[in-house]
């Protein structure tokens, strides 16, 4: 009898600072792992955890916020390291603050990510009311050109199941690799990038 196999993918939570990436990371994990705060730049290094979903394993990565305007040397360094990290992912969960709508900054950062040729799922976060969702739906999202757009409220843990279902569906349709439980840890390549 062969060993049971699992679909495996590296999935990164990506976006500009202060859109709720770390809260979303914790929400998907179901426990507090990343530090969260109400000001930009809380996550300057990345966090990662293995998310076990029956026959599906996700190496979930919470990345530092990307900026379109790089003013300081530290901004440039963080952007470079984050983009190096993103280049090693299979799927990007691109997070937008739904209360802000589609801004020029989101478009500029998304364009940078798109050039890395990764599968992108658009996550509209901080959607605590139907009014916020309806207002966002009036925005022109055609620029992003992605089939998957999911509304979530990480703070209230809403929309998580939709994200998980979409991730599993994407991995199945795109033939991501299968690994056995015994070789999962060996097969999972560590992402050795640090921002100091």
PLM regions: where:
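Conserved nucleotide-binding/hydrolysis micro-motifs of P-loop NTPases
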Residues: 41-42, 65-67, 99-101, 126-131, ...
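Generic N-terminal helix/loop capping motif
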Residues: 31, 54, 66-67, 85-95, ...
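Conserved G1/Walker A P-loop phosphate-binding module
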Residues: 1-75, 79-85, 173-196
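Conserved ATPase-coupling elements of RecA-like P-loop NTPase cores
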Residues: 69-73, 98-108, 131-136
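Canonical P-loop GTPase G-domain recognition
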Residues: 118-121, 126-181
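Solvent-exposed alpha-helical segments within well-ordered globular domains of core cellular machineries
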Residues: 9, 26, 58, 80-87, ...
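Conserved beta-strand/loop subsegment of P-loop NTPase cores
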Residues: 59, 89-96, 113-128, 145-152, ...
């Amino acid at each position: 009898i062969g060993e049971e196999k699992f679909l495996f993918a590296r999935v990164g939570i990506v976006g500009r600072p202060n859109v709720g990436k770390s809260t979303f990371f914790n929400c998907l994990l179901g426990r507090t792992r990343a530090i969260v705060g109400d000001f930009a730049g809380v996550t300057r290094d990345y966090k990662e955890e293995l998310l076990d979903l029956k026959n599906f394993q996700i190496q979930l990565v919470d990345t530092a916020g990307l900026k379109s305007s790089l003013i300081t040397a530290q901004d440039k360094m963080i952007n470079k390291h984050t983009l190096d990290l993103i280049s090693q992912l299979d799927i990007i969960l691109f997070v937008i603050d739904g209360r802000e709508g589609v801004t020029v900054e989101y478009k500029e950062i998304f364009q940078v990510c798109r050039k890395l040729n990764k599968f992108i799922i658009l996550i509209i976060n901080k959607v605590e009311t139907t009014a916020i969702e309806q207002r966002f739906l009036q925005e022109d999202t055609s620029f992003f050109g992605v089939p998957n757009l999911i509304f979530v409220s990480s703070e209230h843990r809403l929309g998580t199941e939709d994200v998980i279902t979409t991730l599993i569906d994407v991995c199945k349709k795109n033939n991501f690799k299968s690994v056995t439980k015994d070789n999962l840890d060996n097969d999972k390549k560590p992402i050795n990038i640090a921002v100091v």
